[in-house]
Amino acid sequence: MIPRLRIGNQTAIACAERMEPFEFALRHGFGAFEWFADKKEYPGGSAAGWDESDMDQGLRAWIRDTGEAHDIRFTVHAPWQANPLHPDGVPLLIRSVDFARDIGADLVNLHLNMAEGAPGFVRSLEPVIRYAAESGLRLSIENTPRTTPADFNQTFASLRELDAVGPGTVGMCLDLGHANLCTPTHNDFIRYIDELAPEVPIIHLHVHENYGDADSHLTLFTGPARIDDAGVRAFLERLRRRDYHGALILEQWPRPPQLLIEAATRLRELLSLSSPGRVDGGPRIEWRRFFDARV
């Protein structure tokens, strides 16, 4: 099977109707979609967003069947509170794994937390790794603005020492906007990527922009890349070097949502136009084989 890079979008707490972003993905033929359990409850009983308790078995089955019918790769983003270092973190992650299994998702994503160092994080995550593997799922660990390339190099070195981690079980979710905000690589997300050890497997992508001032989650090509897309081109080249195949999630719900279509279309153009020449003496590889022919 030819590996494909699937562009998709994500649920959004800003939507009054939680299914609106998914319906948008279906309508526009996206190849991936991420379910982010980001429910927030307010004083007075009102709430925004959703969590797994809002998705009964009937709805989960419908999501799974719809994804299969439309050839959409699902991923699940665990709640931001799902920190395995906290007492309630592992149960939240297990709940996300169960939801992911029920809808036929590929992986569950969570944030790296270095409060107890790489060994402490890996130890706390071990039961979730085992449970995910038994459920046929992978875990992706996402960089936050506070976590550095060195943190990921250390974390994956610790993971390699863990018997529970089989090949391909755990990888990194590279968040481009967070990499741009990280202090050691501020406003230089390409440097962030280049400082990741080759042994750190990138298996998932969150893509958004900022100006280095805040985690603003600007749609791709509406921030700095609107004027100069050299950084995006360099990012795509790094993906090619790593032989990346998987989802690329546009992690925002802009107004108008049409900006997502424009970003996906522009990415498609860059992937098609990228030079197929050699990189570091490597073989000649056509970019098109990395890209899902749909938007």
Model-predicted segments: where are they?
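Active-site-proximal loop/turn and secondary-structure-junction residues that shape catalytic pockets
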Residues: 11-15, 37-41, 78-82, 112-116, ...
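Short, solvent-exposed loop/turn segments at secondary-structure boundaries
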Residues: 46-48, 85-89, 119-122, 183-186, ...
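N-terminal pre-domain/capping segments
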Residues: 1-101, 105, 167, 171, ...
